[in-house]
């Protein structure tokens, strides 16, 4: 192993995560807080751990994350994407299994903009026939 640290950038909705992975004991630090403190919801924590559990490296890597923008779901998705990219930098042979699980592809869904004359992006004003 030439590099001691592996990097991956992850994005989801309006969130961007910078992920640094190195060989260690399995600590995940998000914005200088432990994962369990940063995310209150168990689903968010589960989403972050998914790629590590898939390749069975939960206890083998220390992960340091800086994440900005968006809300909980977007940030968790961005971290997952970043961890996936860092894992692929660590070992390219993990790519097929990560792709099969759907972690490699960037989720391009974003909030649709509100249009003029409508109440929301697609919600039309109530129609009264008479």
From Swiss-Prot:
Signal peptide positions on this chain: none
A molecular function (GO) term: structural constituent of ribosome
GO biological process, one term: translation
SUPFAM superfamilies the UniProt entry points to: Ribosomal protein S5 domain 2-like
Keyword check for Transmembrane helix: no
Keywords linked to the UniProt accession: Ribonucleoprotein, Ribosomal protein
PROSITE patterns documented for this protein: RIBOSOMAL_S9
Gene Ontology cellular-component annotations: cytosolic small ribosomal subunit
One Pfam family named in its UniProt record: Ribosomal_S9
UniProt KW Ligase keyword: no
PANTHER family, sorted: RIBOSOMAL PROTEIN S9, SMALL RIBOSOMAL SUBUNIT PROTEIN US9M
HAMAP family associated with the record: Ribosomal_uS9_B
Family that this chain belongs to: Belongs to the universal ribosomal protein uS9 family.
The protein's name: Small ribosomal subunit protein uS9
Origin species: Shewanella pealeana (strain ATCC 700345 / ANG-SQ1)
